[in-house]
Amino acid sequence: MVKKSFILVIPQEEKKGSVEFQVSSFTNKIRRLTSHLELHRKDYLSQRGLRRILGKRQRLLAYLSKKNRVRYKELISQLDIREPKTH
């Protein structure tokens, strides 16, 4: 398994309960699970876990987008993730 360096976007004094910290930790988990699933395609339990984490991250990003658009844009660019489609 290829391990990539984890993203350290949030400073240490930032609270672990903050939206930015949660989104960055979910992004780390998503990247780890994605590399795992490239090797183990039939690991359906991990696929389900990945979908759950993706949904949680999407909901947190939607919340942050509504509350503070500037912080949302900064976080999206720092984590190098795409902006979700809006319906």
From Swiss-Prot:
Alphabetical UniProt keywords: Chloroplast, Plastid, Ribonucleoprotein, Ribosomal protein
Molecular function terms, GO-annotated: structural constituent of ribosome
GO CC, any one term: ribosome
Ribonucleoprotein found in the keyword field: yes
PROSITE patterns referenced in this protein's UniProt entry, alphabetically: RIBOSOMAL_S15
Source taxon at top rank: Eukaryota
UniProt-listed InterPro entries: Ribosomal_uS15, Ribosomal_uS15_bac-type, uS15_NS1_RNA-bd_sf
Entry keyword Ribosomal protein: yes
One annotated GO biological process: translation
Main location per the UniProt record: plastid
Subcellular location per the Swiss-Prot or TrEMBL entry: Plastid, Chloroplast
Family that this chain belongs to: Belongs to the universal ribosomal protein uS15 family.
Subunit and partners: Part of the 30S ribosomal subunit.
The protein's name: Small ribosomal subunit protein uS15c
Species in which this protein is naturally found: Illicium oligandrum
Name of the gene this protein is made from: rps15
